[in-house]
């Protein structure tokens, strides 16, 4: 769509362009004459342009009219703006319409049906030059520059209000308003070394020195702004994820001791506590002192040295091990752990008591339990000793009895041969002599049996033992019936011989 606007009241022509006093009117007249003489060719793009594009072109033309005013303001002669404003607006709209029509001869399009466009006359430098406006807005690409720059203006004003130092999001005010602001490290870039000598080599050297001299291990904390509370939670609770609990308890303690800690805060104490309760807000020396008093444990700070550079004491004297932290890069804390002496849980819940009286009852109970355990172990060991001794004695007694039995059997087998020989010799002698009567021999045999079978042997036999066992026991113990019975019971082979009668009782 091509729109041609004609400036009313312009009486000049292209022949009057040589006048320096009326250059603006002559230029508008020349443009009007050119547009009146040149026939407008058929526009083929209008057939393809939709209603939305037509509305867009109209809106752009309106926007460029205002841009033309802006260009007029930026000129070197602001006094001529009111006189030439109408001319400038008309010229800009005319040029923009030419820029939109791709086949327009004024915009430099090649058309065989249209005559060549004559060059415009030169303009004097003393007046407002509308050609400069055309050079800016004479093309379709330049047509989009005006609104874009105008829209970017307010955004640049808003962004200029941001903090020039790139402060932490948790900072309450900008850097220019931080007079008396305690947490100045919150405005520093996160985890940037504050001195050129710090780096990986220095970190490794410090870690090696502290391990060699003190035996401490550096347990690294997450670098998220909660490093101080993470390190303290790792030392006290054994879990760095309990950092929020340590933070809130620290703020509660500082609020409880407002009269003391407010002396070290140069800003509003309530706003300070409110900000420090937020996540990822740095902790400083004030919070470290509060943590030392709250847990009643001294806090030792190590920073690239084997000795603490700062020590924070609690309220009371205590013998609990200190909380050891390592300070890196001027804004990060890690936990220093002694692997041979764990200090997790020391001082929990007893911040108002001395450390040497904290676990008095528990120590007594532990000592008593240890003593009872030692007594039980001693009794058990004694029982084992006596049981072993008894078994040893029984084994010795058994071996002695077996040895004596073997000896008896050897001796008992020899006397049985002797009486037979004596009986045969007696028989030979008696056969030669007078033979006694049979009545005399029978009582002699009965007496012999009575003398051999004593009362102890008979008692053993009555208990169900064999004659050989009774005779063996009798040969060893004599008439001691109890010893004979015990011996027979011991020498009986397990379940081979049944224990009968009074022996089982």
Curated annotation (Swiss-Prot):
Leader peptide range in chain numbering: none
InterPro entries, alphabetized: OTU_dom, Papain-like_cys_pep_sf, Peptidase_C85-like, UBA, UBA-like_sf
Gene Ontology cellular component list: cytoplasm; nucleus
Pfam family, one: OTU
Subunit details: Interacts with KDM1C.
Disrupted gene: phenotype observed: Up-regulated expression of GLP2A/GLP5A due to derepression associated with H2B hyperubiquitination of the target chromatin and H3K4 hypermethylation. Abnormal hallmarks of euchromatin including H3 hyperacetylation, H2B monoubiquitination and H3K4 trimethylation in the gene encoding OSR2 leading to its increased expression. Repressed expression of the AN3 gene associated with epigenetic modification (e.g. H2B hyperubiquitination and reduced H3ac and H3K4me) of its chromatin.
Catalyzed chemical reaction(s): Thiol-dependent hydrolysis of ester, thioester, amide, peptide and isopeptide bonds formed by the C-terminal Gly of ubiquitin (a 76-residue protein attached to proteins as an intracellular targeting signal)
Low complexity compositional bias, start-end: 9-30, 159-173, 421-441
Localization per record: Nucleus; Cytoplasm
EC class name: hydrolase
Region listing for Disordered, in residue ranges: 1-191, 416-447
Bias (Acidic residues): 73-86
UBA domain ranges (all copies): 446-491
Residue spans crossing the bilayer: none
Compositional bias annotation for Basic and acidic residues: 51-72, 174-188
Family: Belongs to the peptidase C85 family.
Species this chain originates from: Arabidopsis thaliana (Mouse-ear cress)
GO annotation, biological process: epigenetic regulation of gene expression; negative regulation of DNA-templated transcription; negative regulation of gene expression, epigenetic; positive regulation of DNA-templated transcription; positive regulation of growth; proteolysis; regulation of chromatin organization
Active site: 224, 227, 332
Name listed for the protein in its UniProt record: OVARIAN TUMOR DOMAIN-containing deubiquitinating enzyme 6
Protein task: Hydrolase that can remove conjugated ubiquitin from proteins in vitro and may therefore play an important regulatory role at the level of protein turnover by preventing degradation. Binds chromatin (e.g. nucleosomes and histones) and has enzymatic histone deubiquitinase activity, specific for the H2B histone. Can both repress (e.g. OSR2) and promote (e.g. AN3) the expression of target genes by associating with chromatin, deubiquitinating H2B and regulating its euchromatic histone marks (e.g. H3ac and H3K4me).
UniProt biased composition (Pro residues): 115-124
GO MF annotation terms: chromatin binding; cysteine-type deubiquitinase activity; histone binding; nucleosome binding
Occurrences of domain OTU (ranges): 216-339
Gene symbol of the encoding locus: OTU6
EC number(s) stated in the UniProt entry for this protein: 3.4.19.12
Chloroplast as UniProt keyword: no
